[in-house]
């Protein structure tokens, strides 16, 4: 299975270990970054993961940032993504089996890597259990999506990156 994997600078080390875990399970990893510890913006990498999944380049996606909240919010803005921020097996399985989640998000500073890998493995192996009720619910959620032409622009975040380069942002 092809898994898109993205993170921010805070958890690059965690992402690399998750990548190795996925490869050891026979999955192909599409690593969309970030690749080092240089400060960056998590929405960039949430967007990249979501685009890989929605385009069909990846079967599923995994997003990781410090708490998981920011990158998961960002990936959920990509039309067609259904991502769940999880910290336990029950939530991850519910997201996949009942809501047909195609991305899973984690707080790399919140949850341990071993548990994260166990949850990812279970999420990948779980199957959506379609019912009339959950199909209707998913359709309602999809109806809430807003698509903007700017989202497809590869320079969508350039304004923020330029401000960072000029020293206008600080952690």
Swiss-Prot record:
It comes from the Bacteria. This is Galactose-6-phosphate isomerase subunit LacB. Keywords: Isomerase, Lactose metabolism. GO terms for biological process: D-allose catabolic process; galactose catabolic process; lactose catabolic process via tagatose-6-phosphate; pentose-phosphate shunt, non-oxidative branch. SUPFAM superfamilies: Ribose/Galactose isomerase RpiB/AlsB. The lineage of its organism: Bacteria, Bacillati, Bacillota, Bacilli, Bacillales. Heteromultimeric protein consisting of LacA and LacB. It holds the Pfam family LacAB_rpiB. GO terms for molecular function: galactose-6-phosphate isomerase activity; ribose-5-phosphate isomerase activity.
């Amino acid at each position: 299975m092809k898994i898109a994997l993205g993170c921010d600078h805070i958890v690059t080390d965690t992402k690399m270990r998750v990548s190795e875990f996925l490869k050891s399970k026979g999955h192909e990893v599409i690593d969309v970054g970030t690749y080092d510890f240089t400060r960056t913006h998590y929405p960039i990498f949430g967007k990249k993961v979501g685009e890989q999944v929605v385009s069909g380049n990846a079967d599923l996606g995994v997003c990781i940032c410090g708490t998981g909240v920011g990158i998961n919010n960002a990936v959920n803005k990509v039309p067609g993504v259904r991502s769940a921020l999880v910290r336990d097996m029950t939530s991850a399985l519910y997201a996949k089996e009942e809501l047909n989640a195609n991305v899973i998000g984690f707080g790399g500073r919140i949850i341990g890597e071993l548990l994260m890998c166990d949850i990812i493995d279970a999420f990948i192996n779980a199957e959506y259990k379609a019912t009339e009720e959950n199909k209707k619910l998913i359709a309602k959620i999809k109806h809430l999506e807003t698509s903007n032409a700017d989202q497809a622009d590869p320079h969508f975040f350039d304004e923020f990156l330029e401000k960072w380069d000029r020293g206008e942002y600080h952690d």
